[in-house]
Amino acid sequence: MRWMLRAPAFGLAFSILSWSSSQGPLAGAAASTELTVVGRRNATPTVAADGAFVAVAWGGAEASGSTDIFAAVSRDGGRSFGAPVRVNHVAGDARVNGEQPPHIALVSRPHRDPAVVVVWTTKGEQGTKLLQSRSDDGGRTFAPASLVPGTDAHGNRGWQAVAVDSRGRVDVVWLDHRELAHDTSMAASHHDHKAAGKPDGVAMAQRSKLFIGSLDGSLAPRALTGGVCYCCKTAVVTAGDAIYAAWRHVYPGNVRDMAFTLSRDGGRTFAPPLRVSEDKWVLEGCPDDGPAMAVDRQNRIHIVWPTLVAGASAGAEPNIALFYAMSIDGTRFSPRERIPTEGTPHHPRLVIGADNTMTIAWDELANGSRQVALGRAAIDSDGRPRIRREALGASGSGVYPALATAAGSVVAVWASVSSDASSIQVRRLAAAGPVGTGQ
């Protein structure tokens, strides 16, 4: 179907918005929907769900590069969606990409639609900041944006992740480069994704921080550690009073491996950073490819990430592979296990259903194009999954997937982009509802 609508009034003139939504039959119980704001490059989606209420946010760029944030909601588990609404009141103020998309979260409320919260990166004269906006009418309108507490300092920040705790507090982790703001050459290197200066890139990386805070300010923003890899997405999960965070860390020798920390007291204190796996990926720059994480019903922590591995045979070039590890208590992780892929994998996401069914999504390069693929597994009694690869079978290119569990299924979203068209694809997959999940 194709829609023409006027966006909600923001106190200023706003042009007619055209969008389309199409649905097509799939095998089995799966169903798909396409979300498109016509005339925009639709990309960088995220998704959240609360029962049958599903919300998708994404960036829509004009030909000039000016980018806005859009959101659309479903009340039937992702089978159909209403017309998208522009989230940001200031036209073109978004600065988003695949590793720092607009993140959407839902805050449960009894006997009514959940509150819809969106967090995104915006441009500023002194660097980038994080903005937040909230809808209390089921995604029909959004309040004027406000700054995420702690993100108004000079310098660049972003690569954020969000999670909602059991009390409805929305927690955010992000990478923050305020300590590099005085060095314009270093600030430029972050935009170019280059190594953090020479001769001592590790020492410079210590000036880049992992921050945490809450949207309402009740969890005061603060740095948890330095030494973060500058342009890789982060991951955060909440479960009960616990907060779990994961990121790519810069270890001595410019080694860029996964790190993890947790709080068991609602964010008041955090454990020292823990290395997830000694992959020893040496890189003079940022791979733009961070971790995904979820927590199951037994509070076991599951992490998926990409890293560089040696070629399969003598003389073969190194290549990127996708790995999985699990921790029972957050003090150490199991040896990594390789996830089966059929191309070069990037940009993983992960959710776990109420029945401890795990779904992983990533995009992989094969035969000259990127396609979205899945890893599915039932978690054994010892906490270990047996992961099998499944192709989504989507036509066209697919990049930067995201996942949520909704009403007994998993909802997968991704961007489908070609030379003359772009859309956000939404597909329902047979599975169970959420436990502890994050983005």
Spans of model-derived segments:
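Bacterial N-terminal signal peptides that target proteins for export
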Residues: M1-A9
